Amino acid sequence: MVSGRQGVGIVFGMEPIWTPAPARVEGSLLAQFMSVAGVESYADLHARSIADPAWFWRQFWDSCGVVGQAGDRVLIEGERMREAVFFPDARLNVVDTLLARNDDSLALMFRGEAGHALDMIWSELHARVSQYQQALREAAVGVGSRVAAMMANTPDIYALMLATASVGAVFTSVSPDFGAAAAVDRFSQVEPDLLFASDRYC
């Protein structure tokens, strides 16, 4: 297998500054992907991805753990890259992938400016997301709704963001240390249907 760094050095006509040890290369996610895809070198993978982008992106979907249905079509090509449509028939919610784990391992680690510490395991995060989901549904928040939050970057705001995305709504937030005018300017752009606010800054 030829590493990506070696390939870069060859292309630009110079020696690489650093080359990883073979064991590190073999243990990389890229090497694992190449093995599953059945290609021998990075150069082969790159060439195949250009010659057959639909093949490449199907391989990527199948190997990266996305939870959802990819659909039959992988790529609708446009005249320019920005016009291309990937997986037009896919059905998924990114939260299903982000919350694929539900065990007692660490999910979030929070340390506040005043020394407050909070660690949240995956099962606790699931429970907190569920609480927010229920509150959102009771407030008739769904696909296309807009939810805003004036909250610090604690595990709670991540749970709220995940819950909002899980019901198909749009999420935006500002920190409590925003001034009133700045918060109004941000939120007025999206005209939220529901606003969450914390009573303190962590």
Where do the language-model regions lie?
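Short, Lys/Arg-enriched N-terminal segments with co-localized hydrophobic residues
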Residues: 5-13
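N-terminal amphipathic, basic-rich helices that act as targeting or association modules
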Residues: 12-82
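AMP-dependent adenylate-forming
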Residues: 30-31, 35-37, 95-121
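Short, surface-exposed connector motifs at secondary-structure boundaries
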Residues: 41, 140-146, 165-170, 193
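Conserved AMP-binding/adenylate-forming core of the ANL superfamily
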Residues: 44-48, 108-162, 179-184
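A short N-terminal helical cap/helix-turn-helix that marks the beginning
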Residues: 48-50, 58-71, 88-109
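Structural core segment of the AMP-binding/adenylate-forming
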Residues: 162-202
